Amino acid sequence: MMDPAAGSGPDGAAVMPPELPALPVAAEDPMALYRQVLRDFKELFFCLEPMEITRYVHRNEGRCLSLGPPKGWHVMLRTEDGIITAAKQAASKLICCREPLTPLGYAVILLPEPRRDHHDGMVATPYVVFMGRFSRVYAYDTREKYMVLVSHNLDELARYGVSRSEIAYRDVIHTTLRRMTVPVPRRYPKGARTMHVLFLNDTTPEGSYATAERILGCDVKLHTPGYGTVIMRLMKTVQQLHRIWPFCALTEVESRRWWWAVRANLATPWYVLGVTGRPRPGRSFVAEVLVLLDWFGAVYAIQMDDPNHYVRRVANTITEFFRMGLLKMVFRHRRFERERQRQTRMEHRHLCPHHHERAVDHKRDILFNEDAALPDERRERERRILQQQYDWLCLTERFDPHEGAWERLDPNTLVLHRYDTNSQSYVLDPDIVGVEAAEREAAGHQDDTGPRLHCLVTTRSSTREGAERVITALVHQSRLVTYSDPFPLKSLTGVREYIQI
């Protein structure tokens, strides 16, 4: 991909981007990023037409605007080049309605000051950032040819940034970050146990693994950014699943129907990784989400309380899964791609973000006096109302200086959700999901050595080299290793895209 930091002016002369802005080193102020996004996008917020946005990008080419959390994500303003033009054409075909998408530039990650050197002050990404109506922000992946809705409006962008989007957790991004920065060891609480999850078969010659904090036995913590931490119980076989609810209530015929449906949906050999849920003292573990891997390492999930039990992809790799958890289930319906590609990848279908805009446009026509004889009067009124809205966004009384957004003050409040998130889902409290109770129980079992390595492997390999392929360092750290072989794929007649379980 072309370096987003370089560009050319209208006369063909090279345009050098301004010096990269300094990132805040300290994190004492939890609202610093929120205010930074509001400041950076202020002029764009008042742009009434796509051409105004384009002129702003031309005037400020090379400037970096903050995209909010995670810290470091910015959009570097760039006028249209070949890549951006192609991305704009592709994105316009993916969007569900006729919404004008104006390119802002490339998404980049600025490195903190201590980690920058003379040449590498940022990490380029394959994402082109667009702005739509009502300050909606989209990002188009030029490699995998899909687009995600980053935020519905400026307020959501300032609060959550790209933390609700899958683009922030891709392996390609984090691999580049590790290569360009000083490695920082992951810190776990004092006395914490860890579990390595290893995936290894003929499709992954080098193998891949992720590390999770282990609670007790095969229970590990799975964190979903913006949602919370839940308990995930790693499983090896279907027989182990029959010990937990609701699988323990299935008859043999119903169980066979389940696994046949999973096999038909994935169309490859597959592994059981485990289930998320909550333990019940003296009773069966309650499974809420079943997590599977296909032969190529992609991670899928089945929501148990969904009557259709659709199999949906939640991550491309096991490392991405333990990095973003169930993000694509909690904040779903934000991905736009070709229908055939969506069906092949088994992604959630997007929901139209323009659902309520007809009523909004009607109210705007009333407020902005569309019937006014002078168009300048209408534009002046529109800018005045936008200024009032922007001033409201900047009110400090909307937030608590220590807790962040005002709705976080009430632990029983509903998650701030739209129609594309899980409706009526309460803010995850550790006591509700059983994390704190499990930690208290684990504290009483300090002598627990338990499994340290969970392997998803092919023990039968066609080559000697494959049979001897092992990550030795992980095995030596392990007091007890568990193995999970893939379930075999039996040929099916015909093509069945989606089979309800």
UniProtKB/Swiss-Prot annotation:
Secretion signal, residue range per the UniProt entry: none
A Pfam cross-reference name: US22
Subcellular location as annotated: Virion tegument
InterPro entries: US22-like (IPR003360)
GO CC term (a single one): viral tegument
Keywords associated with the record: Virion, Virion tegument
Main location: virion
Tagged with keyword Transport: no
Source species, domain of life: Viruses
TM spans (from-to): none
Family: Belongs to the herpesviridae US22 family.
This protein's name: Tegument protein US24
